[in-house]
Regions:
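FMN-binding flavodoxin-like domain, especially the glycine-rich phosphate-binding loop
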Residues: 1-112
């Protein structure tokens, strides 16, 4: 399961290629917010990914707000990862992301 946000399409392309390569479902964060969908269940062996552009050296507000409302039911060994696209420097985007994820009991084990 990959949650993504993209304004220009760059991150959408990256997230789509990763989803195809690893066989994961791709979910667009703005659509989920419009639908009021925040509860998800990870299947056994399913990974959880987040893809987003870096805005001002951090994840976009829409991503942070979505994570605060997110409710994930998962296996104890569920693997979480995150990828950010950026022009030159991701700043503290992943540190901020992991602080948000910690509020719902998750941590991105690998970040790109």
């Amino acid at each position: 399961m990959i949650f993504y946000f993209s304004r220009t399409g760059n991150t959408r392309w990256v997230a789509s290629e990763i989803a195809k390569a690893i066989g994961e479902e791709l979910l667009y964060i703005p659509d989920l917010i419009r639908q009021g969908q925040y509860a998800f269940t990870l299947k056994e062996g399913e990974r959880l990914g987040f893809c987003f552009p870096t805005h001002g050296w951090q994840p976009p507000r829409i991503v942070r707000d979505f994570i605060r409302r997110l409710c994930i039911t998962k296996a104890d060994d569920a693997y979480c990862w995150a990828l950010t696209t950026c022009g030159d420097n991701m700043g503290v985007a992943m540190t901020i992301l992991n602080k948000e994820l910690a509020t719902i009991g998750l941590k991105a084990e690998t970040t790109f």
